Design a protein with these regions (language model features):
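Metal-associated gating/positioning segment near the N- to mid-region
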Residues: 79-152, 168
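General beta-strand structural signal in soluble alpha/beta enzymes
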Residues: 73, 132-133, 160
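Bacterial N-terminal signal peptides
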Residues: 9-18
Length: 188
């Protein structure tokens, strides 16, 4: 396995270690890591056991050790690193092909929610265990955050801003670029 692929796999596993789709439980988990980049700037450590209790890392020990009753994830052939944090995401957005005006006029918050569920899983699998959503439909992002926190769907731990604020015609105005002939009396 190449270094890039190994880091990607390890990042995803580290993400799953920090936040899984299941709610926190008292069960212990141990990860046998072939290589550990701990994020402190120290040299890479080899052949370590990472003990996780209640979704939190409680120790990193030299060698492959397994406490009694712990579930083992064998990453002895992989590189593991801490979960990453993305501090600027729009988790409900997806860039669809086709006419952007048509998309803006026909998409609903339900479409955004479906995209958000897919994007949350993809974000987690890319190694990001925490993300800050800086603008999206408030009901959608709060529901997504709660579903992840409750273990209903996989995704990173989320901090959400809700619907972005801005001046009419400014950044974040969904009506930007629309033909004036498409105006609706209820929009003013």
């Amino acid at each position: 396995m190449g270094l890039r692929k190994g880091l990607l796999v390890a990042g995803a596993c580290a993400a799953l270690m920090g936040l899984s789709a299941a709610p926190a439980s008292a069960k212990d988990l141990v990860i046998h890591a072939g290589r550990l980049i701990d994020g402190t700037g120290k040299p890479v450590r080899t052949q370590v056991s990472i003990l996780v209790h209640d979704d939190r890392i409680v120790s990193v020990d030299a060698g492959y050790t397994t406490p009694s009753g712990a579930e083992v994830i064998d990453l002895s052939g992989s590189t593991v690193l801490p979960g990453l944090i993305d501090d600027h995401v729009h988790i409900t957005q997806s860039f669809h092909k086709g006419d952007p005006i048509h998309t803006a006029m026909t998409r609903t918050s339900f479409d955004d929610e479906i995209d958000a569920v897919v994007n949350a899983r993809n974000t987690l699998m890319a190694g990001f265990t925490s993300a800050r959503d800086v603008g999206g439909d408030t009901q959608v992002v709060v529901a997504l955050k709660n579903a992840i926190k409750g273990g209903l769907i996989p995704g990173p731990r989320l901090w959400v801003a809700g619907t972005p604020l801005g001046p009419t015609g400014g950044h974040g105005d969904a009506a930007n670029g629309l033909d004036p002939e498409l105006e609706h009396p209820g929009w003013t």
